[in-house]
């Protein structure tokens, strides 16, 4: 019946200024809100509070903070994670950051193999390199090329429940899993 947006920007309090608007189109109902006065390049945690009971993260978020699993991600893989406000909320929270710079592609100089000549290696990053880090994976590309591999199919890299899974239990399709490194390293 009602949904509030709660987060760092309103001290995780129910506030009528953060009551989401409800719009219906044919048989489709959408909830939306405009949040003002956010600082550019600052990360804010937030959740949706549904009917005053259920706290959920935005399923379309590009980053989540997971109070149960992020503590097991080594700092060498994901340095300086945003702190989870245990005293304010529970469950997974979404992260929003306005004013982010667009990703600047570093390599545009590559050739894709003909689809009839593909030799694909399906890979779970976590199991392929010991430290489960994308940078280490990049260092092993010569090894794969020497085997004749010309394409890599990564097993799911988006967030999923826990850190030790093949990723077939996805939960946030647009949020790369922090267990493999920061999004700037992808």
Question: What does each model-found stretch correspond to?
Answer:
Residues 1-43, 51-74:
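Aromatic-rich carbohydrate-binding modules that target alpha-glucans
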Residues 1-6, 56-117:
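Basic K/R-rich, polyanion-interacting modules in nucleoproteins and related proteins
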Residues 9, 24, 37-39, 124-129, ...:
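Short, flexible loop/turn elements at secondary-structure junctions
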Residues 28, 116-118, 168-171:
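Short, solvent-exposed loop/turn segments at the edges of secondary structure
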Residues 56-61, 131-136, 156, 163-167:
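Short, solvent-exposed loop/turn and secondary-structure capping segments
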Residues 87, 95-151:
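An acidic-aromatic substrate-binding cleft motif
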Residues 144-186:
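Aromatic-lined carbohydrate-binding/catalytic grooves of carbohydrate-active enzymes
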């Amino acid at each position: 019946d009602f949904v509030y947006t709660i987060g760092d920007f309103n001290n995780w309090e129910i506030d009528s200024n953060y009551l989401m608007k409800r719009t219906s189109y044919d048989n489709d109902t959408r909830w939306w809100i405009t949040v003002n006065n956010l600082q550019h390049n600052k990360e804010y945690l937030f959740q949706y509070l549904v009917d005053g009971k259920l706290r959920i993260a935005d399923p379309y978020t590009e980053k989540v903070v997971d109070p149960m699993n992020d503590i097991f991600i080594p700092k060498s893989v994901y340095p300086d994670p945003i702190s989870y406000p245990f005293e304010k909320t529970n469950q997974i929270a979404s992260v929003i950051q306005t004013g982010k710079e667009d990703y600047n592609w570093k390599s545009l100089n590559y050739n894709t193999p003909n689809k009839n000549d593909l030799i694909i290696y399906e890979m779970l990053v976590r199991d392929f390199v010991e430290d489960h880090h994308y940078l280490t994976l990049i260092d092993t590309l010569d090894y794969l090329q020497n085997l004749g591999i010309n394409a890599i199919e990564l097993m799911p890299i988006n967030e999923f429940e826990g850190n030790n899974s093949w990723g077939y239990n996805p939960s946030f399709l647009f949020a790369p899993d922090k267990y493999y490194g920061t999004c700037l390293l992808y």
